[in-house]
Amino acid sequence: MERVERIIEFEIARINSHLPRARKSLKDLLNMEEPMITLRDGSVHYFKRQELELLASLLDEEEIAMLRLPMVLEISTVERDKIIIRGKVEAKVIRKILGFEEAIIEEPILKLPRYYLPKIRRILPTTTVHAFIVEW
């Protein structure tokens, strides 16, 4: 069984090769002439400036410095019908983008039905990325 688990983990790592090696703050990306990051597979991912500016318009200065991009939308093997967004600022942005009311308490984890994934990706195609998470 251990061999099968290693194979599955290898395949998940392969399908997640589009994830960033490191994320950058919205503030740093806004200050770059060509906002970009390097992905795990060595390729470069470019951010659309108008998308970065949209995100900045939703946040205050402190939050702009805190928001790390791209935001990771997790797809879990356990909660297959949900996507998970981690981070207080990230969750706030997604709630605003989807038109949800302000939360009374800002939670650091936001779980949404998976059918929101295409809508989020359509609105924020370069500042979000989905990741497949294996949980046993």
Curated annotation (Swiss-Prot):
It holds the Pfam family DUF61. Transmembrane segments: none annotated. InterPro entries: UPF0216. It comes from the Archaea. Belongs to the UPF0216 family. NCBIfam families: PRK04115.1. This is UPF0216 protein PYRAB16100.
